[in-house]
Swiss-Prot record:
Gene source species: Arabidopsis thaliana (Mouse-ear cress)
Domain SH2: residue ranges: 574-642
Gene3D superfamilies cross-referenced by the UniProt entry: 2.60.120.200, SH2 domain
Protein name stated in the entry: SH2 domain-containing protein B
Keyword terms, alphabetized: Phosphoprotein, SH2 domain
UniProt modification remark: Phosphorylated on tyrosine residues.
Lineage: Eukaryota, Viridiplantae, Streptophyta, Embryophyta, Tracheophyta
Region spans: Disordered: 373-411
InterPro entries registered for this protein in UniProt: ConA-like_dom_sf, SH2, SH2_dom_sf, STAT
Length: 668
């Protein structure tokens, strides 16, 4: 039987790898069309440059295809052909030159066909085979004029981790004038897995429009494999269903007695992991049931995730259902309230945690490591792996908390309390993506007292089952205020500031917030910060805010608890600076098992629940590289609470997987 290899995954590539050259002096390409399919992730921010242009006479590249602040795509003149082309040095000039723009917002998490038709006298922009607009321009070139001028231009994307645009591209081609954009649109559309939400059965809707499924009843969802223009695709592939926690994204796991998600096939129930379903004519119906995970799972939100078996981990070859609230139904139970209930403490492992590293067999808590979740979509909620704070907590000698369940009932008077910040706002925050969360927190901190923000943080932690949300919410007011003041000092009312003039102010703020004046940031640190901001020679407020949402949580973490001492240490240098996952992996190539490097992951930006966290990258006993997030209760509490605690480095070296500190190898 054919496998998932029947899907040609090699034709999909990262947007950051896109690069084509065009010979505009070639008679066939005096007018040309750049055509491609693009899939942008939700982590894309606006404004952003999708494709840039450069030729041999340019020292700095200029934008060619951009997304503006209103999420509309704009096609700009070509520097080699058009007098109206944007100035590569003046980053604001592209907003002032003639351009062709889409009429509506550019969609994310969806395949879109883009066609850019360029000639010496006009430009046309096509979306999904339809012309969005046309702009006439003035030609710079004439026949046999300026023979010394370059005739080849490169079009490329910068994309990638830490930049503002991340996504995938397929079937990118430069076509001569004789080929039509519409033909390319129909030629080889990319594939996409989806859930047909309109055909679901056994699912109920509450008053908020949230799906509800009983732990005791089957429900069905149809999964479709189609191309980007909506045609069913007949591929001999199998699809596997799994259950995810909607707040933290790891797979739901129970003991060995029962699987969290069951599937019925030929009248028999199986664990969904053990029973992939084959697609027939591009479609299959999944009959599913969520197990009775525990009484504490009532009202908790889940997603059903579908993925093609043995296929690469592309987001467009995966699909998720709407959030589903798992409820228990019995004659004695009253109808479920629309308001989410508080979650009691559920102490379970996510699918990506390592049990041997998490297990505590003594009265003294060890450091806890949880595997870092790596995903193309930054706004998707990465693994948080924290516990709801609904238990009584006692501290041991290391300042780390042991949990004791409190089974006493909640006082009826307290359960009826109403706070200024509504339950619907709390619910919206729990379900929102990172951009939604950030906007909500800005509004809440502007209109609420400190006590109200603290109560909001506690409620979000209870409803979502993730205490790390509380940490990000509680720092929101300070993060926003510090960032606003920093930009005022940096910009001095200028919209664009040269990067060299920003470095000093950034370092001053970082050293003050991190409470560590003895260690300065290095050139490599600033280069990574510039990469995170997405800027080049000049930085805008949008660039600064992207960088600040990563830097502030890191500085905040360094100022607290056990990390501060490690950051201050110069011999050995436990945390060498701001490094990428790729740099850490490169440095550990060929090292002995147990060698490790500590880093702040650049994919975690505020208000992600793990923003500012530390990740340990190490060589395992299998000589493979592993990435795990440090899991220490109260690691970001004030350092005064750790006067009797062991140094963090001692606790790290006590881990069986870790034995020696590695060093960073720079490629330059």
């Amino acid at each position: 039987m054919a496998s998932a290899a029947t899907i040609e995954t090699e034709k999909y590539s990262l947007l950051e790898d896109f690069n084509v050259d065009v010979e505009v002096d070639d008679e066939e390409y005096e007018s040309f069309s750049l055509c491609f399919w693009v899939y942008l992730l939700n982590s894309t921010t606006f404004p952003s440059t999708i494709i840039r242009q450069v030729h041999s006479d340019m020292s700095v590249s200029a934008p060619f295809l951009v997304l503006d602040e209103n999420k509309k795509m704009m096609l700009l003149p070509l520097t080699l052909l058009h007098k109206e082309a944007p100035d590569p040095v003046d980053t604001s000039s592209w907003t002032q030159v003639p351009s062709v723009s889409t009429k509506s917002k550019f969609p994310l998490e969806k395949w879109v066909h883009v066609g850019c038709e360029v000639s010496r006298n006009f430009m046309r922009l096509f979306i999904d085979g339809n012309m969005e607009g046309e702009q006439f321009v003035t030609s710079l070139l004439t026949k046999n004029a300026y023979p010394e001028c370059p005739r080849k231009i490169s079009l490329f994307s910068v994309g990638g981790d830490g930049y503002s645009v991340q996504g995938f591209i397929q079937c990118a081609e430069v076509l001569p004038a004789s080929d039509h954009v519409e033909h390319h649109y129909m030629k080889d559309p990319p594939l996409m897995l989806s859930v047909n939400k309109s055909s679901s059965s056994g699912i109920k809707l509450d008053d908020c429009g949230v799906w509800q499924a009983s732990c005791k009843e089957m429900f069905s969802l149809d999964v479709l494999l189609s191309n980007a223009i909506g045609q069913p695709v007949h591929k001999d592939v199998e699809v596997v269903a799994s259950l995810l926690y909607a707040d933290t994204l790891p797979e739901a796991k129970m003991g060995e007695a029962e699987a969290p998600l069951l599937i019925r096939d030929e009248g028999v129930q199986f664990s969904s992991d053990d029973r992939p379903i084959k697609l027939l004519n591009g479609r299959s119906s999944f009959k599913l049931k969520i197990s009775q995970l525990s009484s504490n799972s009532d009202d908790r939100l889940f997603w059903i995730k579908f993925g093609i078996r043995n296929a690469k981990d592309y987001p467009f070859l995966q699909a998720v259902s709407n959030p589903i609230r798992c409820i228990s139904v019995s004659p004695e139970v009253q109808p479920v309230s629309v308001t989410p209930k508080r979650l009691t403490n559920i102490d379970h492992l996510s699918s990506t945690e390592s049990p041997d590293l998490l297990q505590n067999t003594s009265s003294v808590k060890r450091i806890r490591l949880g595997k870092e979740s790596v995903s193309g979509s930054e706004e998707s909620y990465q693994q948080c792996n924290s516990h709801p704070q609904t238990s009584r907590q006692f501290e041991n000698g290391n300042g780390m908390r042991l949990h004791e369940e409190d089974n006493s009932s909640i006082d009826s008077e307290n359960s009826e309390m109403r706070y200024t910040i509504s339950d619907s706002t709390i619910f919206k925050y729990c379900l929102g993506n990172l951009i939604d969360k950030a906007l909500l927190l800005k509004e809440i901190t502007n209109n609420s007292s400190d006590d109200e923000v603290l109560e909001f943080a506690n409620q979000v932690s209870l409803y979502s089952g993730c205490s790390h949300h509380s940490y990000q919410i509680n720092m929101a007011r300070e993060l926003i205020a510090e960032g606003t003041n920093a930009w005022i000092l940096i910009s001095r009312n200028n919209q664009h500031v040269h990067w060299d003039n920003v470095v000093y102010e950034i370092e001053e703020h970082f050293m003050r917030i991190s409470k560590c004046s003895s260690r300065s940031l290095t050139h490599q640190d600033f280069e990574l910060l510039r990469r995170i901001s997405g800027c080049y020679e000049y930085i805008t407020q949008e660039n600064f805010e992207k960088m600040w949402c990563w830097l502030f949580p890191v500085a905040y973490s360094i100022s607290r608890g056990l990390i501060n001492g490690m950051w201050r240490s110069s011999s050995p240098k436990w945390i060498e600076g701001f490094i990428t996952k790729e740099e850490a992996e490169h440095s550990l190539q060929g090292q002995e098992p147990g060698t490790f490097i500590l880093r702040f992951p650049i994919s975690r930006t505020w208000p992600h629940p793990d923003a500012g966290s530390l990740v340990v990258t190490y060589v395992g006993h299998d000589f493979a590289l592993h990435h795990k997030q440090l899991k220490i209760d109260n690691i970001c509490e004030s350092s005064e609470r750790y006067m009797d605690a062991k140094p963090l480095q001692d606790m790290l070296l006590a881990e069986p997987e870790l034995s020696r500190l590695g060093r960073i190898k720079r490629s330059h």
